[in-house]
Amino acid sequence: EANGENNQDGPDYNFSWNCGAEGPTRKKGVLDLRDRQMKNAFALVLLAQGTPCILAGDEFANSQKGNNNVYCQDNLTGWLDWRKLEREEELFAFVKGLIAIRKGYPVFCPEEELRGMDQTCCGVPDVADHGENAWQAPSEVSSRQLGVYYSGAVLEGEDCFVAYNMHWLKHTFALPALPKGKKWYQIASTEDGILKKAELLKNQRSVELDERTVMMLAGR
């Protein structure tokens, strides 16, 4: 409406959610959930295959006051407030950490598309989906959780596993067995942030994720 075009300057439907409050709020629960969802979104983008696309200011929670098309807003709505870098230091550090993970693990930025096949005859495909059972992706249409295993064999790097739980309930993910001598370590999550030192998982067969959480594991 602020653009003065009767909402004709973009699609009518927006894939968005205010987390329980419209606009600015002081409710800690809403603010914490918004922060978690921003981190989840960055994990989805930066750990996906292909070239990640990020709008300037996303890394420090620039909201444009809910306006997703600020082409005509030469004002505070469309400008970037760089002072938010200090206020959103935690989110900014998380995004930088995710970028470092993407660059540090070849499975997240291969030169060729992963095929879901065992290209090196190592016994596992280069990428595979998992759920509560290993090697079995959730089949329900309403499912909001998925585990993705990346084999490092093709690129001679470490195996990785990313568990996505977008549900409002906790879920358990089965972990694929690693080659002899290797263990799963947590390297980051949208709940704990980027870990300075990888933590060995006590349970090497499964991992439980809290609601609306993404966790990244490395096999080493």
Predicted regions and their residues:
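Alpha-amylase-like alpha-glycosidases and glucanotransferases acting on alpha-linked glucans and related
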Residues: E1-V30
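Carbohydrate-interacting/catalytic domains
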Residues: E22-K39, L44-R220
